Amino acid sequence: KASSIGVILEGVILIFILTLVIIGKQISSDFVILNATPIEWIILLTWLVGLYLIYKNPTLKNSKLLKEEKKLPAISKKKAHTALLIFTFCAIIVLISGVLLEMSSEEISNRFHISGVIFGATILAAVTSLPEISTGIASAKLKDYQMAVSDIIGGNAFLPVLLLVGSIISGTSIIKSIGPTDIYFTCLAILLTGIYLVGLIVKSKHQYLRLGYDSFAILMVYVLGLLGLLYIVK
């Protein structure tokens, strides 16, 4: 299972970063650095420090996974370069697809008179999660569960860093334009991450459909969170 100290550390860092987003919204200072507020730079610093702590985590160096990797045959440079090219190509495709999804989702929500918030929180969120789903399935087949979990948590931790990039490019601080719905989803993400971390520490002795109590709790809280979104939209 992926219940290692490294994954728990990733979850804690994610909670730190999401909390900083909420704090940044509440601070009404006009002081900016390269069009970005200090809190946006602190988010970047927190993310970088988190990467360093994960890299230096001693449990990762002695993990069973690394011991098994040492037994694997060496990969030729040609195969490694080919894999790198494929990885880069797929990353570019995902980037272009993200732009097209944003454009098409706005058109669909306007045409069918669907709230942009509702559409983005459900359909668009599910579609943009397809890379994580496919990566998770592939990692599960390889029995590399830690990679599957780290992909999800790491991706969520990196996204707030893009607030800094967006602020620098657009010329105005994006974190100041965050609305109540964004704060709501940020709090929901913190709550879900907290439940997940509890599930990693406190193991479920009983499972149903190969899912523990923590998984059902996460699903229930997420559904209730979406229902609560309806009251915010109103």
Where are these regions (language model features)?
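Hydrophobic alpha-helical segments, chiefly the membrane-spanning helices
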Residues: 1-234
